[in-house]
């Protein structure tokens, strides 16, 4: 990667635009959730990263539709919402200056014309104009795409089951789950969400707890000795209101090998927790 693969992302400077992207991305995830067969860990609600932004991946259409499937993409390079179908038709709408409600209505109309009926809560998509800073979006996309590459490398080196590198709109974060292969004592093995020992790794733009972008690593159940374990370079332990290892994004900006620092954080916490989970 280039030396500027990770641009500065101070949340205070683009939080309004981040919140706008959250509303736009919610449309993609809600459409996917409504039409995709249910999967464990809500993997029918997540989005994924492609070469230009966020994607729903292939969404199956109902049997009475005129197309077999479609895909929605939020292109963060061209600043556009794109809907493509298996019959070659599509729709492109600009994101800049777009009302979330209008995106919803246009998407609903396009799909309805092909026999795909959406039943979403229109109140989730405001009718008010929202800020959209193209330069800030492009910086975020540069960071997100490069983070996704590192997460992919981390996933490739994991033994055992792991989930897809996923994007979740409710917290606007990138996420990866890893499973130890052991069941959690006392939990019904049929409980798809909580029966398995697991770890979550992610990247978020910031929130009410940590008001700046950061990486996190958590474990379920949390090993008692993990909070006192030695953390990887640059990382700290977050104890309230949730517990997990944290690496501030800003640490990457001044590090000579930012990808190595991030990969070391992910691998280091995973190995430490995996030893203590046994």
Where are these regions (language model features)?
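Long, hydrophobic/aromatic-enriched structural stretches that serve as scaffold segments
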Residues: 47-122
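Ser/Thr/Asn(+Pro)-rich, low-complexity disordered segments
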Residues: 63-73, 102, 205, 209, ...
